[in-house]
Amino acid sequence: MINVSDRDGTLRNQKRHWSRHAANYDDVFIDPFAEGVENPLWMALGAVADPGGKTVADLGCGTGPLLPSLAERFGRVIALDFAPGMLEQARKRLGPQQARRVRFLERPMDDLDDLAEQIDVAVSVNSLVMPDERLIDRTLRAIRRSLRAGGRVMGIVPSIDSIQYHSMLLLDQALEQGLTPAEARRFTAYHAEHRYYDFAFGGFRFEGLRQKFWFPFEVEYRLSKAGFRDLSLEKVLYPWHDLFGGDFDLKAHPPSWDWFFQAVA
């Protein structure tokens, strides 16, 4: 049984931390919409038929990087986030004219009962990151109930396996430079910032924020568990840059990634 008071306290703490990071979010976290990123979400959104007659919901919209495109393409747009600071930044990004076309909701992603069977496309970009797996499951079930029959969920989740891939490359470089295995592991742990991660359970902690990073099999498992079908997974490919632990000349290797998913209700 979930202790509701504990859950509410955790949500309040996370709302405060996410709001505090809202102004500099785009500078701190890797942007799946940045130039040079290969993001399958754009093609998936472009494939939605008759978007002008459909309702799209950006769940956990954050600072709203996707909202201008959604507002231009879809007939009705919902922007939901539990952090008021994020919604404030999203409104600023849109500007007054576009913001009037968007319905803003300040609430958690699992609070969708009043939207049951009203959404055609639900989008979640780096927002299914709750550190409690029970809340992730509850949120996915809520999203499925909010979708009309045949509606689609699509989104991006941060990848824990890409951190392990990055670590492997750094370890090899350190060994090739003559470090001992023990020295190479310390070098890798420092530059890949292992202190922030729980690799067994996909946990991430940074300046008060707590997030879930995903293995691909978890995406398949949890979406299926929530009742979704026809699931597909693709990589969001990021060019190597400073946020990946410094310039260690990794450009000769395949890029790092997050996971893009889409499924049908």
State what each model feature region is.
Residues 137-149:
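A short glycine-rich, Lys/Arg-flanked "PGG" loop and its adjoining helix->strand segment in the class I
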Residues 1-51, 154-185:
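Conserved class I S-adenosyl-L-methionine
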Residues 246-265:
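Core SAM-dependent methyltransferase catalytic element
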Residues 123:
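A conserved beta-strand element that flanks and buttresses the S-adenosyl-L-methionine
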Residues 229-239:
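Conserved S-adenosyl-L-methionine
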Residues 57, 63-111:
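Class I SAM-dependent methyltransferase SAM/SAH-binding core
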